[in-house]
């Protein structure tokens, strides 16, 4: 019985470390400028551009859709384009959620870049300053 318990404990411990992701140290990030905010009925379209470490010049378009009448949370759907420093263009769909607290909005989403990389991404968006502070955590590296 003791051996069975120790085996089970070891399996749980090992499995936890095998499949967990480290969200304490971002792989990279940067600051993007808000270029446009276009309000709609229950949604807003937003575009951003700027520099992200590891990716170079980044261009992003989001549609933020509200899920409640107070318009303080919802879903986001978008596209990203990046021109790497070597001139290669990479693309990604963006899917996630957002939460607004006054003039500050938090974005949480994943990307699936066409080079095989997968990232979990967090943005701190300041609507008044028209800036977004970006952090990304690599879940899987590129295929190359």
Each PLM stretch: what is its role?
Residues 1-4:
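Positively charged n-region of N-terminal signal peptides that target proteins for export
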Residues 19-144:
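Beta-strand-enriched cores of mature, soluble protein domains
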Residues 7-16:
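Bacterial N-terminal signal peptides
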């Amino acid at each position: 019985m003791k051996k069975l318990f120790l085996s089970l404990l070891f399996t749980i411990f090992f499995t936890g470390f095998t499949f967990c992701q480290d969200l304490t140290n971002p792989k990279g990030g940067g600051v993007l400028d808000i270029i446009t905010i276009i309000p709609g009925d229950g949604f807003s379209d937003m575009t951003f551009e700027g520099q992200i470490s590891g990716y170079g010049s980044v261009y992003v378009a989001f549609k933020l859709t509200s899920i409640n009448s107070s318009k303080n949370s919802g879903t986001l759907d978008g596209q990203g384009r990046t021109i790497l420093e070597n001139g290669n263009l990479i693309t990604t769909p963006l899917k996630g959620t957002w939460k607004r607290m006054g003039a500050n909005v938090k974005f949480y989403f994943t990307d699936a870049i066409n080079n095989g990389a997968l990232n979990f991404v967090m943005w701190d968006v300041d609507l008044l300053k028209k800036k977004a502070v970006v952090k990304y955590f690599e879940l899987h590296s590129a295929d190359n």
